Amino acid sequence: ILQKDPSKLKLGGERKEMSFLFMDIVGFTPISEYYKNNDDPEGLVALINDYLNRMTKIVLNNGGCVDKYMGDCIMAFWNAPIDCPNHAEMAVKTGIECAEETEKLKKIFKEKGLPPINIGSGVNTGTCIVGNMGSDTRFDYSVIGDAVNLAARLEASTRNYKTETGIEPLIYSSYTKDQLKNIKSVELDKIKVKGKDELVTIYKPVI
């Protein structure tokens, strides 16, 4: 893209409807303590990198763009810089596949005697500003806006919904649900989200 249009290498953004995913390891403290007690910080870094590598491949295979890593948290988005008409579908599909990959990791962790690993993912769809943000000398291609913030809030809310194997691995908003053509959804709850006056209806996929 940059080779075809070098003008994109400048500060500025555009308004666009997109889908956003935030994903985080839940219960990371026991895992961190395990490596700390065994005096193995290198092992912890290797574990995080393995997790990030697995999940990043899924994001990229589904046409997503990894915005940034924040510790063990991944932020990704769809529909920029390359258009993706079914961006909501691909974001939810990514969340489902990441949850499936985590189940494989759980078995590996169990074999190694590690504490169980769970992930929580939140997806939202809405209008944001996307573009190069930063200074004249250093900038990142990123997204900002209320719709982005809601995805992060939803990810944090996954901790409130327990399952037999951990927590609800993926929840998304009605804005995302309304654009899903090939994924069935079930309403999970109506929740109060910081910065929102009205309750937000959240859903999970029927797998």
Briefly describe each language-model feature range.
Residues 1-16, 33:
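Regulatory cytosolic signal-relay segments
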Residues 17-30:
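Catalytic-site or vestigial catalytic-site microsegments of nucleotide-handling domains
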Residues 28, 55, 74-75:
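Hydrophobic framework residues that shape the active-site pocket
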Residues 46-64, 80-121, 146-159, 184:
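Alpha-helical scaffold within the catalytic cores of cyclic-nucleotide enzymes
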Residues 66-68:
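A short pre-motif secondary-structure segment
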Residues 70-84:
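Short beta-strand->loop micro-motif that forms the acidic, two-metal-ion catalytic signature
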Residues 77, 115-131, 170-171:
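A short glycine-enriched loop-to-beta-strand structural element that forms part of the catalytic core
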Residues 128-130, 157-207:
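Cytosolic regulatory/linker segments at or just downstream of nucleotide-handling modules
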